[in-house]
Swiss-Prot record:
A GO term, aspect molecular function: SNARE binding
Cytoplasmic side: 1-189
Record's function text: Involved in transport of proteins from the cis/medial-Golgi to the trans-Golgi network.
Stored InterPro entries: GOSR2/Membrin/Bos1
Disulfide bonds: none
Protein name stated in the entry: Golgi SNAP receptor complex member 2 homolog memb-1
Lineage: Eukaryota, Metazoa, Ecdysozoa, Nematoda, Chromadorea
Membrane topology, record value: Single-pass type IV membrane protein
Organism expressing this protein natively: Caenorhabditis briggsae
Length: 212
């Protein structure tokens, strides 16, 4: 029993020493090696304690109480070291995770190529939209010009018709009311044509102002 006790006590001291090494590691890879070694030793310590309990049960009654006290004290030391290792490992795991997340955040934030590409894509989309808007305005102006030319031709036709109607009316002796209706229609057409001209001028001015 004494040899088993001394061996277990020596292994406990090794675990305590390795715990200090664990706290001094600088990177996760080295720390994982130490952690695996410590957990393996703790598992061995628990097996040794079980063997010591068997030895104590076989001791003579006069020596059994003293042996039990030594083994119980050793068990308490092992439990304290086990809890300390778990606490240190948890704290270091959180530190590694925080460092990894911080590194990922910094690498995602400072990527000049991606930023430049994003800005270039945005400018390209904006340029496409401006070009599309210019084409639509050009189409509207072309349509307005075509409508204006059509109205002008219709107006000249109406003026020719109006003159002919006046001539025919005078030749046929149409009443003044009929001639007044024709004149009013011609004036309304003039107002409509002028309104279309003003609308086209406004559209052209807005287009020039918008393009800068």
């Amino acid at each position: 029993m004494e040899a088993q006790y001394q061996s277990t006590n020596f292994l406990l001291q090794k675990v305590q020493h390795d715990l200090g090494r664990l706290e001094g590691t600088q990177n996760e890879q080295d720390a994982q090696v130490v952690v695996q070694s410590i957990y393996g030793d703790i598992s061995t310590l628990k097996d040794n304690l079980q063997a010591l309990d068997n030895y104590v049960s076989r001791e003579q009654p006069a020596r059994r109480q003293a042996a039990r006290m030594r083994v119980d004290q050793l068990r308490m030391d092992v439990q304290r070291v086990d809890m300390a290792v778990s606490a240190v490992h948890t704290r270091m795991t959180q530190r590694w995770r925080s460092a990894s997340e911080r590194e990922e955040l910094l690498s995602a934030r400072y990527r000049p190529n991606d930023t430049a590409l994003s800005i270039g894509d945005h400018e390209l989309q904006l340029n496409d939209r401006l070009h599309s808007s210019h084409n639509r305005l050009d189409e509207l102006i072309s349509q307005g010009s075509a409508v204006l030319d059509n109205l002008k031709s219709q107006h000249f036709s109406l003026r020719g018709v109006s003159r002919k109607m006046h001539d025919i009316g005078q030749a046929l002796g149409l009443s003044n009311s009929t001639l007044q209706v024709i004149d009013r229609r011609v004036r309304e057409d003039w107002i409509f044509v002028i309104g279309c001209i003003v609308c086209c001028i406004f559209m052209y001015a807005f287009y020039r102002f918008w393009r800068g």
